[in-house]
C-alpha cells in the first residue's frame, strides 16, 4: 500500500519537511536501492524504467522506496541487455547522454538518472532548474566541488550533513560514478547498494564527461 501524498519532490533552495523525509530515507546507510535493483536484476523480465526522478519515487507505509509510473518503460527479453531506441524518453534534467546519440539503451540510463536524483537530494537543488537556467550544469558543479575538496558548498546551511563529511563524500562519489557520460563506466545498482551499505569500497571517480583509453574501475 502506498502512503497518501507519498511522492516527494526535491525543490531548489528549499528544505521542506517532505524533502527532508525523502533525504533521510534515500541517504540512510541501510538503503538498498531495492526498488531499482529489483526491476533491473531481480524480476523475471528485466525492466528499463526510462524516467527515474523524485516524483516517481514513492514511500510505502514502512517508508520503503517504491518506483511508480512505468508508462515509458522498456522490457528486455531474456538474454537481452540493450534495447533499440525509438525516441527520447524521460524528463529534462535526468536524460542520460546516450539518449541524444540515438544509441541503444540499457539499464544504465536509469543508473544515470539515479545519480542525478542523488545529487539533487544531497544539494536540495533541482537539476531541472540548472538545465533551464544559465548556471553551470549541476553535475559539472558537483564534480568541481568534489575535485576541489569543497563539498561544503553542496550542503550550505545543512548542519546535519556537515557533521558527517565522510558519509557525504561517499554519497557524492557514488553519484558521480552514476552520471558518467560513458555508460560502461556507470556501476550497476547492485554495486551502488553495496557501496552505500559500506560492503565494498569505491574508487576515485573521473570527470563525468571524460572518456579515457584505460577506463577506471568503480570498485577499489
Question: At which residue positions do the language-model features occur?
Answer:
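Conserved eukaryotic protein kinase-like
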Residues: 1-220
